């Protein structure tokens, strides 16, 4: 791997684990967690603030990290990923990796790139249409963005639909949609979202909301019932392949 670039990015973590969400659950990946996000979702379980250093897993899977100074340039990241072997792909996550599209565009790796995105930055997504093999795109429902003004929520929904259209499935790229379903999720909102992107994706994942913070002790206050999610799946199956898959890495206790 070689690349020359003056681009650099603030990265929070680099480590090896397995994909814990969606249709590729269980595949071995290197994870590059970028700092920074343009949203503030109610159920977010990730600290994505910019830090002066990046936590880098010294030996894949051993959970022992060393501090690497930020920002990290493209060539350095390629070098840091070299020791991780037998990978299905490299997951670009965050935060929001599309904030770093110019950086990602210059990456040259021997394995495919797997983008985990909130799908609200279409101009950034446009830059990566030829670079990404797997798109794990979220559809952030308006009720998940309660702290954002209503007009801004509408803009995010429009931008999400644009992103799915730009990064839609084709012969060289898989694209699927993940929708987090919680107690306050309105089924009619999920159906509208699914209708808007069904033709662009290989499947829709309904992900039961994972309790975070104090909600861990009282999950019934944040989680939708099994019956509710099953009923929603039945409706969406009229539009696209729809699966119910919780966050498996939380069950296993891995990163």
Swiss-Prot record:
<feature type="binding site">
    <location>
        <position position="93"/>
    </location>
    <ligand>
        <name>substrate</name>
    </ligand>
</feature>
<dbReference type="Pfam" id="PF04055">
    <property type="entry name" value="Radical_SAM"/>
</dbReference>
<dbReference type="InterPro" id="IPR007197">
    <property type="entry name" value="rSAM"/>
</dbReference>
<comment type="subunit">
    <text>Homodimer.</text>
</comment>
<feature type="binding site">
    <location>
        <position position="33"/>
    </location>
    <ligand>
        <name>substrate</name>
    </ligand>
</feature>
<feature type="binding site">
    <location>
        <begin position="18"/>
        <end position="20"/>
    </location>
    <ligand>
        <name>substrate</name>
    </ligand>
</feature>
<comment type="similarity">
    <text>Belongs to the radical SAM superfamily. 7-carboxy-7-deazaguanine synthase family.</text>
</comment>
<dbReference type="GO" id="GO:1904047">
    <property type="term" value="F:S-adenosyl-L-methionine binding"/>
</dbReference>
<protein>
    <recommendedName>
        <fullName>7-carboxy-7-deazaguanine synthase</fullName>
        <ecNumber>4.3.99.3</ecNumber>
    </recommendedName>
</protein>
<keyword id="KW-0456">Lyase</keyword>
<dbReference type="InterPro" id="IPR013785">
    <property type="entry name" value="Aldolase_TIM"/>
</dbReference>
<keyword id="KW-0479">Metal-binding</keyword>
<comment type="pathway">
    <text>Purine metabolism; 7-cyano-7-deazaguanine biosynthesis.</text>
</comment>
<keyword id="KW-0949">S-adenosyl-L-methionine</keyword>
<dbReference type="GO" id="GO:0051539">
    <property type="term" value="F:4 iron, 4 sulfur cluster binding"/>
</dbReference>
<comment type="function">
    <text>Catalyzes the complex heterocyclic radical-mediated conversion of 6-carboxy-5,6,7,8-tetrahydropterin (CPH4) to 7-carboxy-7-deazaguanine (CDG), a step common to the biosynthetic pathways of all 7-deazapurine-containing compounds.</text>
</comment>
<keyword id="KW-0411">Iron-sulfur</keyword>
<feature type="binding site">
    <location>
        <position position="37"/>
    </location>
    <ligand>
        <name>[4Fe-4S] cluster</name>
    </ligand>
</feature>
<dbReference type="InterPro" id="IPR024924">
    <property type="entry name" value="7-CO-7-deazaguanine_synth-like"/>
</dbReference>
<dbReference type="GO" id="GO:0016840">
    <property type="term" value="F:carbon-nitrogen lyase activity"/>
</dbReference>
<feature type="binding site">
    <location>
        <position position="95"/>
    </location>
    <ligand>
        <name>S-adenosyl-L-methionine</name>
    </ligand>
</feature>
<dbReference type="GO" id="GO:0000287">
    <property type="term" value="F:magnesium ion binding"/>
</dbReference>
<keyword id="KW-0460">Magnesium</keyword>
<feature type="domain" description="Radical SAM core">
    <location>
        <begin position="24"/>
        <end position="255"/>
    </location>
</feature>
<feature type="binding site">
    <location>
        <position position="44"/>
    </location>
    <ligand>
        <name>[4Fe-4S] cluster</name>
    </ligand>
</feature>
<keyword id="KW-0408">Iron</keyword>
<feature type="binding site">
    <location>
        <position position="46"/>
    </location>
    <ligand>
        <name>Mg(2+)</name>
    </ligand>
</feature>
<feature type="binding site">
    <location>
        <position position="41"/>
    </location>
    <ligand>
        <name>[4Fe-4S] cluster</name>
    </ligand>
</feature>
<keyword id="KW-0004">4Fe-4S</keyword>
């Amino acid at each position: 791997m070689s690349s020359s670039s003056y681009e650099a990015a603030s990265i929070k973590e680099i480590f090896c684990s397995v994909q814990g969400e969606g249709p590729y659950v269980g595949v071995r990946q290197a994870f590059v967690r970028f700092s920074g996000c343009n949203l503030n979702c109610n159920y977010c379980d990730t600290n994505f603030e910019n830090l002066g250093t990046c936590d880098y897993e010294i030996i894949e899977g051993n959970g022992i990290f060393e501090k690497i100074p930020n920002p990290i340039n493209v060539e350095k990241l390629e070098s840091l990923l070299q020791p991780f072997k037998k990978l299905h792909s490299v997951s670009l996550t965050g935060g929001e990796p599309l904030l770093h599209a110019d950086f990602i565009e210059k990456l040259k790796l021997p394995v495919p790139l797997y983008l985990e995105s909130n799908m609200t930055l279409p101009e950034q997504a446009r830059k990566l249409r030829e670079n990404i093999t797997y798109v794990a795109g979220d559809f952030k429902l308006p009720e998940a963005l309660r702290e954002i003004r209503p007009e801004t929520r509408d803009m995010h929904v429009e931008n999400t639909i644009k992103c799915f259209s730009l990064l839609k499935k084709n012969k060289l790229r898989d694209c699927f949609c993940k929708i987090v379903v919680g107690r306050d999720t309105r089924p009619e909102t999920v159906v509208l979202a699914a209708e808007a992107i069904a033709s662009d994706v290989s499947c829709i994942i309904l992900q039961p909301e994972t309790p975070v913070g104090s909600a861990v002790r009282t999950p019934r206050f944040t989680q939708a019932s099994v019956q509710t999610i099953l009923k929603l799946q039945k409706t969406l199956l009229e539009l696209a392949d729809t699966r119910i898959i919780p966050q498996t890495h939380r069950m296993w206790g891995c990163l």
